[in-house]
């Protein structure tokens, strides 16, 4: 994801990575899962809202697009595989294992930036605690109760929230189409929660 952002822009990188719900849908269909048509519609309408919100016109690197799509596919596989492990071992354990091995694998590539981390220790602690610690633990805990396809739709709200908060903090102006995209993603997120709630009620009755 970060390589995709480096070669293009933050908006393009985030938009490509958050196409992963579509890949979750494709993988689940190949696995023979029975996915309702409404769920398919929610995923694609949600991505359309994300498309309106993010600026894809700034794509400048085809390789960056490839990196973004590879990241999306790997994230889809991680969520599908990790959902069962989260139920089995708990969200906190799954988050710890994920971060532990990620740190080992990335350490050779980030050795030169170690001095920056020490010089900006409080910033590093903040990012590590909130973005990685709280974020991943909460995510893997929630996925115990919500199917991977549904969690993908709801997480469309993450880049949307980032754009809106960024606009508020940095005083960036948003286009009308971006507000429309924000409204679509927000409504899709609410619809997904209602859809999952009804399914859980029907399952408990049966």
PLM regions: where:
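Helix-helix packing/entry segments at the starts of transmembrane helices
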Residues: 13-19, 81-101, 132-168
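C-terminal-most transmembrane helix of multi-pass membrane proteins
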Residues: 122, 156-206
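C-terminal transmembrane-helix exit sites in multi-pass transporters
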Residues: 1-3, 20-41, 160-180
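Loop-to-transmembrane-helix transition segments
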Residues: 1, 41-45, 63-72, 116-134, ...
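Membrane-interface helix termini and inter-helical loops of multi-pass transporters
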Residues: 3-6, 51-63, 107-125, 167-177
């Amino acid at each position: 994801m970060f390589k995709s952002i480096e070669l293009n822009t933050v908006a393009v990188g985030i938009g490509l990575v958050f196409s992963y719900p579509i890949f979750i849908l494709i993988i689940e269909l190949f696995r023979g899962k029975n996915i309702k048509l409404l769920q398919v519609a929610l995923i694609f309408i949600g991505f359309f809202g994300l498309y309106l919100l993010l600026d894809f016109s700034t794509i400048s690197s085809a390789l960056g697009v490839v990196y973004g799509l590879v990241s999306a596919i790997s994230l889809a596989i991680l969520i599908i595989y990790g959902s069962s492990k989260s139920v089995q071992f708990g969200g906190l354990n799954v988050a710890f294992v994920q971060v532990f091995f990620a740190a080992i694998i990335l350490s050779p590539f980030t050795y030169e930036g170690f001095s920056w981390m020490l010089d900006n220790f409080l910033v590093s602690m903040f990012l590590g605690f909130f973005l990685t610690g709280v974020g991943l633990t909460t995510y893997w805990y929630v996925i115990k109760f919500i199917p991977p396809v549904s969690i993908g739709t709801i997480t469309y709200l993450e880049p949307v929230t980032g754009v809106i908060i960024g606009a508020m903090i940095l005083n960036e102006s948003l286009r009308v189409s971006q507000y429309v995209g924000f409204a679509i993603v927000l409504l899709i997120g609410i619809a997904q929660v209602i859809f999952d709630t009804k399914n859980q009620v029907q399952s408990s009755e049966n």
